[in-house]
Regions:
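Charge-rich, low-complexity N-terminal segments
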Residues: 2-53, 178
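Short, aliphatic-rich beta-strand segments
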Residues: 113-118
Length: 211
């Protein structure tokens, strides 16, 4: 299912294609969030966007009137003690009062903490979408600090990088290509990239050409 919307200029827009182009056409050479290169999967009714530098998965839905960005935190509250949940909800409400555009909500049977923002499809352009993405990421990092979850999300980021390296090895990437990925995409220095790659390949007993 493809959603076509008439934008402010009166032309038809396939938002899946347009947003995917915005997220994948960067160069990873600037600080601008819209210059980051995202891995985007098109699930027809929504997009899934991931970046090795970001410990969150983004889900981007579109309808005839709005584009919705949802950031999944993976933090479920359904099984927590009532006082714990009350404290979390209070902190989320206080965070919502500090931020514009984006809002934290509880979603699903697991009562997961997610962040969402709705954008008017009729007037949306790349700059507004980029501002919304920046707002989402800023709000998420505010939550991490508020809940003191730095270690948890650093581990998630490390796990994501390890998984990406394993996927690239399975696809036949060379050691040089893996090092280039760690240095240019992740932003590591050469020595750190080599140490991490050695650790990954030794742990999972890959072939000698990766070591």
């Amino acid at each position: 299912m493809f959603i076509y919307v008439i934008n402010g200029e009166g032309s038809m827009v396939n938002w899946n294609d347009e947003i995917k182009k915005w997220l994948t056409s960067g160069t990873d050479t600037k600080e601008d969030i819209m210059d980051m290169v995202w891995n985007v999967k098109d699930e027809k009714t929504y997009l899934i966007a991931e970046n090795p530098k970001i410990p969150f998965t983004l889900y981007i839905y579109n309808s005839e009137k709005f584009i919705r960005i949802i950031a999944s935190t993976g933090l479920n509250t359904a099984l927590l003690e009532p006082l714990q949940r009350l404290d979390i909800y209070r902190k989320l409400l206080l965070l919502n009062d500090k931020i514009d555009m984006t809002k934290f909500v509880i979603s699903g049977t697991n009562e997961e903490i997610i962040l969402k923002v709705d954008l008017d499809a009729a007037s949306l352009d790349k700059n507004e979408f980029g501002d919304a993405l920046m707002g989402v990421l800023t709000s998420l990092y505010m939550m991490i600090r508020e809940f003191q979850l730095e270690d948890e999300f650093n581990k998630r980021l490390t796990d994501r990088i390890v998984n990406m390296i394993q996927e690239k090895i399975a696809e036949g990437a060379t050691r040089e290509e893996l090092l280039e990925f760690l240095v240019k995409k992740i932003g590591l220095d050469q020595k750190t990239a080599e140490n991490i790659l050695n650790e990954i390949t030794n742990k999972f007993e890959y072939l000698p050409e990766y070591q």
